[in-house]
A protein has these predicted regions:
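Acceptor/aglycone-binding surface of glycosyltransferases and processive sugar-polymer synthases
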Residues: 3-16, 21, 33-121, 157-166, ...
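Acidic metal-phosphate-binding loop of nucleotide-sugar-dependent transferases
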Residues: 29-31
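Residues that recognize and position ribonucleotide moieties
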Residues: 69, 103, 129-130, 148
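Acidic donor-binding loop at a coil-to-helix junction in glycosyltransferase catalytic cores
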Residues: 124-135
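Catalytic donor-sugar/metal-binding loop of nucleotide-sugar-dependent glycosyltransferases
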Residues: 134-155
Length: 173
């Protein structure tokens, strides 16, 4: 059915288990499971840990994130920060990479989000697209969940070409 649908179904299925931590990732070899060791400890202090692919020393050269993805994700991240800005704390969250799928969510955090994810998804989000990922971030913010980004390893895709068309879009620019 599509990437977005897979994410929503996967998150709903995860809540049918007894898992206390839910990790969301892609199966194309771009993310390293060993990064979970960096991410999980943050769940002691927050409900959502997002990966960020913007730390150069952790990024494999010639990966699929071209200028369109890198700067587009960063720009959208800053727009989301402005939307939820709090003058008291210089914002409620600091985001740099809203297109990164790799994340860990505590069960209690996902339970607060899941109804909205499922209901809104059917009405607002393209089932084939990647927009579910930044939308998950926005729902977490709106549900007052604590969110932190952690630098992760990002490797060249091993599972074939992207289905999102971002590479074609960037060439069109």
């Amino acid at each position: 059915k599509g990437f977005g649908d897979s994410c929503v179904v996967g998150l709903n299925e995860a809540l049918k288990t007894d898992a206390n931590i839910i990790a969301l990732t892609e199966c194309d070899g771009t993310y390293s499971g060993s990064d979970l060791q960096k991410m999980i400890p943050y769940l002691d202090n927050c409900e959502v840990v997002l990966g960020t692919r913007l730390i150069q020393v952790l990024i494999e050269k010639e990966n699929q994130n071209g200028i369109f993805n890198t700067w587009g994700n960063y720009f959208i991240a800053k727009l989301i920060q402005l939307k939820y800005f709090s003058i008291q704390h210089m914002g409620v969250v600091s985001l740099t990479d809203v297109g990164c799928t790799f994340r860990c969510i505590r069960r209690d955090g996902l339970e607060k989000m899941i109804e909205r994810i499922t209901n809104d998804y059917d009405k607002k989000i393209d089932k084939n697209g990647w927009l579910i990922i930044p939308y998950l971030n926005m729902i977490a913010i709106e549900k007052d969940l604590k969110i932190v980004e952690v630098p992760i390893t990002f490797k060249k895709r091993t599972g074939g070409a992207s289905k999102s068309g971002a590479e074609r879009k960037s060439k069109g620019l």
